[in-house]
Amino acid sequence: MTETIKNINIDLLIPFENHPFKKREGIEKEELAESVKENGLLEPIIVRSFSAGTYEIISGHRRVEVCKEMGIQTVPAIVRDMTKDEAVIVMVDSNLQREHLLPSEKAFAYKMKLEAMKHQGKTYGQVVHKSRDNISDNESGRQVQRYIRLTHLIPELLKLVDEERIAFTPAVELSYLPENEQKILAEEIEYTDATPSLSQAQRLRKYSEQGRLSIDTIFAVLSEEKPNQKEQVKFKTDDIRKYFPKSYTSLDMQKTIISLLEKW
């Protein structure tokens, strides 16, 4: 894999197709912007030659976004000669090193990597072994497989997983429900303001496989009082948004509130 280092006009850079990692606002982006302002872009982005003199970003989408917002015209880049599948693997591996990743990001990243490595003639076992080594010793092949299951969730349910309203393991169970039943479940979750526990999700899956899952069944399951249910204090984002910078995410606001309460 040959590579060269050069400065590239930022207008010639295009995002990676179907990039599974979402744009990040908030504290992390602000810190990156401050670093670029003081020191310039210290770490080159990684790209590959594309069409008509353009370059596809493999690693460094957030850095490019910050540089654009700051009016920087050129960025240092490592230009690598890569196939599409090689580019997918590098893109996924470099982004999996981020400190904070949403379950949906991991899910679609693993799926993309699995498909790319299959194109290279590698087995599933080789794929998950490499993925595990690139993340941590705790990320087993079985866990990677669970993450990929999340790609079968409809967007409404996957959003609840990212927001930590539905826990990871129950979400895996719900991913086996057909799309029409998932849509009904999402509506009932909104109506009851309750999400299924692991045991409830397992029952919903079982009822579905038996052809016994209905709106009434879903409502009855979600309406059950959970043994470990605790009283919660909830705020509407719109009610507290005015007290925080516009760039703050919901997680940033939560961390700030907890920090202030600890000092109270």
Q: Which stretches of residues belong to each language-model region?
A:
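Short, charged/polar connector segments at secondary-structure boundaries
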Residues: 1-80, 86-99
